[in-house]
Design a protein with these regions (language model features):
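Active-site loop/lid in soluble adenylation, ligation, and acyl-transfer enzymes
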Residues: 1-132
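A mid-sequence, solvent-exposed acidic-amphipathic segment
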Residues: 144-147
Length: 147
C-alpha cells in the first residue's frame, strides 16, 4: 500500500510512501510483510529508470526524509486518472464473480467451463474504477476507460 503526502512548500510535488501493509480485494489485512515497502519502491524505481528514455514519468527524486528513505519517492503532482490496471493470467477474485454472471470479464468473453483459479488462454487486461477509500473498485470494459 502507498500513501501520498504533499511536502511543505511543494504544492507541485507529492511524496509517495510505500508501506509494509497488505491489501487484497479492497481490504487492508492485519498482518504486514517486512520490508515490502522497500522492495516495492526499489522495483518501481528500477522500472522508471529503464523507461526514462522511452516515456516521461512522474518520479522527480529519491531525496526524501530519512524516516522514509528507501520506501518513498518524490514525484511530480499530477491529476490521477481513477483507473486501476489489472493484468490477469488466472480467473480469480472479482474476475471470477463477473465470469460466473456473464461469461466474460470486463467485456472480454472467456471460454465456458472455467473454474476458480483456471489459467486463462492468454493474459487479459481488466481495468477497474478506482473507488474512494472504503468503497470497492468496479470492473469496467476498455470502452469505459477510453471515455
Amino acid at each position: 500500500m502507498r500513501e501520498l503526502f504533499v511536502p511543505d512548500g511543494r504544492e507541485d510535488a507529492v511524496l509517495i510512501v510505500a508501506s509494509d501493509r497488505i491489501s487484497a480485494y479492497d481490504f487492508v489485512l492485519a498482518s504486514t510483510i517486512p520490508d515490502k515497502g522497500r522492495v516495492l519502491t526499489a522495483l518501481s524505481l528500477w522500472w522508471f529508470e529503464r523507461i526514462a528514455d522511452l516515456v516521461p514519468h512522474h518520479v522527480v527524486s529519491t531525496d526524501v526524509p530519512a524516516e522514509v528513505a528507501g520506501r518513498a519517492l518524490l514525484c511530480e503532482r499530477l491529476d490521477m486518472i481513477p483507473v486501476e490496471c489489472v493484468a490477469r493470467g488466472y480467473l480469480a477474485g472479482s474476475g471470477l464473480v463477473d465470469y460466473r454472471s456473464t461469461g466474460s470479464v470486463c467485456g472480454i468473453d472467456l471460454p465456458a467451463g472455467l473454474l476458480d483459479g483456471s489459467r486463462l488462454p492468454e493474459p487479459i487486461f481488466t481495468p477497474a474504477t478506482k473507488a474512494d477509500r472504503g468503497a470497492h473498485d468496479e470492473n469496467v470494459d476498455l470502452a469505459h476507460v477510453a471515455r
